[in-house]
Amino acid sequence: MSQPGKVKGQQAFVLHAQPYKETSLLVEMFTREHGRVGLVARGARRPRAGIRALLLPFSPLEVGWFGKSDIRTLSDIDWQGGLPQLAGTPLVTGFYVNELIMKLVARDDPHEGLFDDYRTLIAHLARGSVAIAPVLRRFELQLLAATGYAPTLDRDLAGEPVRADAVYGFVPGEGARPGAERGCEVSGQTLLALDHGALDQASAAVLREARFLNRALLTHALAGTELASRALLNEVAALSDN
């Protein structure tokens, strides 16, 4: 007899896991076709449970589950390999990104493009092939766009094109206005670099402005909800001048 709500062969990453009942784990996963899902990994906390070693964040997985309630049951899991484990600053960054997804992406709301963006980000973090700040800022904006909070970065509130040599005050939920009387002070150069995804060769000043602006945008989207990982990430960013 087939199990109700049976799903197989789903690309996934673990976002978070916590104890559930006596021997199980409640695992939040980000999947490509189903978005964020909550799955019970039965027996995963038993001393010799091999499945627990697979339930690590930032490892590409293929999973299956069954059930029709808000919390389903994990039935299959295979490690897809190919990425080294994160450590140091990339690890802190990864936990920060996972917490953002947990807060902003609703369960059972598919975001295939965002999943692909996340997978690309994790690959960059794991391989250390590029600087962290530009790819993290890019993903933050991709997440905001996917969840309905995309800012307009190339035009001001009057609809005029943003000028690279001007200074703006950016108010999340509204936009950019010439001058810096209100909102987050940011240069037009930074707004255009963010809009064009062109932070790879940006100056330290532009990267700092981009970090502060994105933080303001995310704070607005989170409606004041605090992130446990942000304080540590800010310390790391300050030390690295990202």
UniProtKB/Swiss-Prot annotation:
Record's keyword terms, sorted: DNA damage, DNA recombination, DNA repair
PANTHER family referenced in this protein's UniProt entry, alphabetically: DNA REPAIR PROTEIN RECO (PTHR33991:SF1)
HAMAP family: RecO
Coiled coil stretches, renumbered: none
Family as reported in the entry's similarity comment: Belongs to the RecO family.
One protein family per Pfam: RecO_N
Protein name, entry field: DNA repair protein RecO
Entries under SUPFAM superfamilies matching the protein: ArfGap/RecO-like zinc finger (SSF57863), Nucleic acid-binding proteins (SSF50249)
GO CC terms: bacterial nucleoid
A single BP term in Gene Ontology: double-strand break repair
Gene that produces this protein: recO
Role summary: Involved in DNA repair and RecF pathway recombination.
InterPro entries found in the cross-reference section: ARFGAP/RecO, DNA_rep/recomb_RecO_N, NA-bd_OB-fold, RecO, RecO_C
Provenance organism: Laribacter hongkongensis (strain HLHK9)
NCBIfam families: reco (TIGR00613)
